[in-house]
Amino acid sequence: MPFLAPPHLPSSHNKIKQDPKPGPDTGQLASTSDTAGKPLIEMRDIFKVYKTNAGEFTALKGVSADFYPGQFVSIIGKSGSGKSTLLNMITGIDRPSSGKILIGDTYLQGLSESQFSDWRGRNLGIVFQFFQLLPMLSLLENTILPMDFCRMYTPPERETRARDLLELVGLQNFVDKLPTAVSGGQVQCAAIARALANDPPIIVADEPTGNLDSRTADMVLDLIDELVKKGKTVLVVTHDEAVARHASRTLVICDGELVDEDISRILPHISHRSMLMIAHEAIDFTRKPGENIFSDSGEIPGMVLVIEGELDIRNSDGRKTASAKSGSVIHQSYIKKSIIAGKSIVPGTHGAIRLKVISEENLQSIKTQSRSFRAFMEKLEVEEAIYSSAKEEGQA
């Protein structure tokens, strides 16, 4: 092969640093800079298998992810991909078949149902897609309920806080109304107020803007922004592209697997299944400045993704003629054209680079299975160009 062999990559991402002791720590987590640099939520190798009359169905397949304080994370995927199941693992609405979940210093599988219920009430604000409020209680009473359940704040403080939260979502004139007396969008807003009642460090929402008009949805997104600024961690399952664009981080789930975030970031326009196939076949490389990555001997890779750093394309005299920055895609045709012209493709001078490389054989296999990916690659092949915001130096 013309590219150097990849070094051994540590698999620390798939392990929780220390096996946490199962314990009944049901206090409230910190959501401030006290936890800076440390994940607030750690999920490791989560599997969820359901037994049905038709046999076993695996909804989650080895999911591992970290979520940090102050992140607004959107989780997207097709219906049935595992989005809601993933949230249910965090909220305890369902339990994983195997794997570990650590939130703060609390090992969730070590909690009994009653301990989990108390812990959840203090640490998670949950906005469901359906069945939001108790129909026999007013919006005010629904918002007070989590504070009553967890014995947080004094009774007068609970009512004051509930009224303030309902005003925050524009429902100050409807506090005494029953859920059946207001619109679906207003019920959704009241559910958001209720989720914030105990000032939890983590907000989990399943389609929080699904029943809202555009104006109210914008208000909810602004509210989420304010919560994130205060250090809250917000996880949202959504089909709404506006919500996904608003998030600081987007996870794609497909067939129960999380798609590699670098691939979904660089190739957002191809199908989720294509992203997953690329993630399965890609090989990781890390290279230092000065190392020539490709040569004219052996097989040329079908596609290269620049994950971190910058690749320089240089003439034989060392002059840089083009660059491929983080987020770039380089087709085999561009690499061949550069090599034939006597150019070298090397890491930039500012530091090491990280690449994902896919062989020509695997690339062709993916192209035959995905129309959107095939069209994208054919366009790159015809143009013999680098797909990125980087441009040939000197060109407009």
PLM features: what roles do these ranges have?
Residues 171, 175, 195-196:
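ABC ATPase C-loop
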Residues 91:
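Helix-to-loop junction immediately C-terminal to a conserved catalytic motif
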Residues 121, 177-180, 197-198, 230:
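Conserved signature/switch motifs of ABC ATPase nucleotide-binding domains
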Residues 263-316, 324, 330-332:
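Regulatory nucleotide-sensing modules
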Residues 178-182, 186-188:
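Conserved ABC ATPase signature
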Residues 319-382:
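Cyclic-nucleotide recognition modules
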Residues 106-107, 144, 148-151, 155-173:
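Conserved ABC ATPase "signature" region
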Residues 203-206:
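Catalytic Walker B motif of ABC-type/P-loop ATPase nucleotide-binding domains
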